[in-house]
Amino acid sequence: MLEIVIITGMSGAGKSLAIRAFEDMGFFCIDNLPPQFLPKIAELASATKEKISRIAAVVDIRGGELFDDFKDVLQELKKDDRNFKLLFLDAHDEVLIKRYKETRRKHPLSHEGDGSILEAIQKEREKLEDIKRYADFVIDTSTLLPKDLKEKLFEIFVQQKSKEAMLITIMSFGFKYGLPLDADLVFDVRFIPNPFYVDTLKYKTGKDPEVKEYVLKWDVTKEFLQKLFDLILFLIPNYAEEGKGQLVIAIGCTGGKHRSVTVAEELKKTIENQGYKVSIFHRDIEKDIKG
């Protein structure tokens, strides 16, 4: 059966890197495809003598007015029961601005409004808001290096396919550095007593045994973890049955170094003990400690 991956998302979030990664994975790749051509591409691929089994196409706002029909095309593909996945790449506004300044490229919507990069990014985000809701996979590239993005795509579209299982990612983060854009579920653990205020623990992380012991010794932590484990283990099979291919669970504390790290590690162990494959990412663990 023909497999189609449609790549979209914010300009500057890494779509060009992504399409090159798909080419390396053996996909037939098309960049800047008007959405109206998607159903036709699927028909042509099925009719070719040299069988094309996997297609990756970038569809984004460079298509101008043609892009306005993207949502209708996605609905048509779903209605026709086409085997496609929608990948949405995102990044925080300040990261996108920095990338544009470094490359000195113009944003596709820079001709609208006052011409500022920020306004163009905000307009694009509004245009893509509905499209993002259709995404099977959302990746926040704000903190990813090109090789990290390539590895993540390989994990989703090659390794995961062989396992036929949901890709589960647990992320710890600090609220002071912003919410992760690609999280499906966010849990706030700032109610747990903070090791930061213990002099001997301040400069350690939630991976250190002393910090783990401190975080896990409280009754409120024990009760929360049991409720969290029950909820997540209930949700995973139900999400999988619904066809969800990716689940990103974010655990947040103030700075992302102590409580969230410990809780994320405990959650990973519990899910893995049920036979699921889990990856973990401590987004802010290397950030400077400032309280």
Curated annotation (Swiss-Prot):
Keywords: ATP-binding, GTP-binding, Nucleotide-binding. SUPFAM superfamilies: P-loop containing nucleoside triphosphate hydrolases (SSF52540). GTP binds at residues 60-63. It comes from the Bacteria. Pfam families: PapZ_C (PF22740), RapZ-like_N (PF03668). Gene3D superfamilies: P-loop containing nucleotide triphosphate hydrolases. ATP binds at residues 9-16. The keyword Transcription does not apply. One of its GO terms (molecular function) is GTP binding. Belongs to the RapZ-like family. HAMAP family: RapZ_like. Displays ATPase and GTPase activities. This is Nucleotide-binding protein Athe_0320.
